[in-house]
Amino acid sequence: MPDPEDELTPILSRAERNAYRLLLKNDLDPFEFDVAIHAGRVLDGRVTYVLQISTLDHAVSVRETGIPLEFIERSGTAGGDAFARIVDQLVPALIENMKSSRHVPETMAR
């Protein structure tokens, strides 16, 4: 019997790659950030997921919890889907947190 975790790995990896593309679309250098998606809480008998975007040294990060698997499964490279909206909503908070902590990646400092 296949392990459900193994079946989810390509889905989560694709969504992470899409998040990196969305960072680039928001004028952020994706090589300056780390994107991670992992299982979170169980709500109504279903596992939800956590999206975390942080600077490479993890000094600054933002996260969204309670993301349904369906949002992750349907994430696309062009954006415009529910997952893309979540990423787009996290970007301003990420930038604000970097500015307030004076932790600005090199590419943004130029």
Task: Show the residue positions of the predicted features.
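Negatively charged, low-complexity tracts enriched in Asp/Glu with abundant Ser/Thr
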Residues: 1-41, 78-85, 110
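Short, charged, intrinsically disordered terminal tails
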Residues: 4-6, 94-110
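Generic structural signal of hydrophobic/aromatic residues within well-ordered alpha-helices
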Residues: 19, 83, 87, 91-94, ...
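Amphipathic alpha-helical interaction modules
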Residues: 26-66
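Residue-identity detector for glycine
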Residues: 40, 45, 66, 76-80, ...
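Intrinsically disordered, low-complexity regulatory segments enriched in Ser/Thr/Pro
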Residues: 52-89
